[in-house]
């Protein structure tokens, strides 16, 4: 990413908004925005294989592994406004498990892009399934979207929930129910 070019574009944007980019409070804003965008879109410069393969451990277990309440934030691709919330990941290990921190890194990898929550959920699930060859993967993302809170319908307390269920999580109601119960989202 060319930070200097992005800073120049932000400077021009400020002018188009009627601001003076040379005034005291805005002098460094273009540089700061460019740095922030570089970080907030850093997911484009990584890949799941590199993240996960660093920490795969042989473990003969066929149990469900769950990481709950992984904090995440992303930028909505429609308005480039943040959405933020929590991601819950479960998988049924076959012969390998992944280091728990790699699950959080996988969430960050896909969240740090211009995103749709639906796509984010699917990308996390498919990456984990592909890399671990798990018997099943379940991912639930719950998020609040500033594009819905600050503009448009202006609904302050709305929460969007998306899920992706693959393999055993999709095929077995019992497995899916166990996962949703353990993450605290199953309601009879």
Show where each model-derived region lies.
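A domain-level signal for the structural core that forms small-molecule/cofactor-binding pockets
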Residues: 1-188
């Amino acid at each position: 990413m060319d930070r200097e070019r992005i800073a120049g574009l932000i400077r021009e944007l400020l002018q188009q908004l009627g601001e003076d980019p040379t005034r005291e409070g805005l002098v460094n804003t273009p540089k700061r925005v460019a740095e922030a965008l570089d970080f907030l879109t850093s997911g484009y410069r990584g890949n799941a294989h590199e993240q996960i393969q660093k920490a795969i451990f042989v473990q003969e277990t066929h149990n469900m592994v769950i990481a709950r309440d992984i904090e995440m934030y992303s930028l909505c691709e429609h308005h480039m406004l943040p959405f933020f919330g929590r991601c819950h990941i479960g998988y049924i290990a076959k012969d390998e498990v992944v280091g728990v921190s790699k699950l959080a890194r996988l969430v960050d990898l896909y969240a740090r892009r211009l995103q749709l929550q639906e796509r984010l959920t699917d990308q996390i699930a498919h990456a984990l399934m592909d890399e671990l060859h798990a018997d099943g993967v379940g991912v639930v993302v719950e998020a609040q979207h500033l594009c819905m809170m600050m503009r448009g319908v202006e609904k302050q307390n709305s929460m969007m929930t998306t899920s992706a269920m693959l393999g055993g999580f999709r095929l077995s109601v019992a497995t899916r129910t166990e996962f949703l119960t353990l993450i605290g989202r199953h309601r009879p």
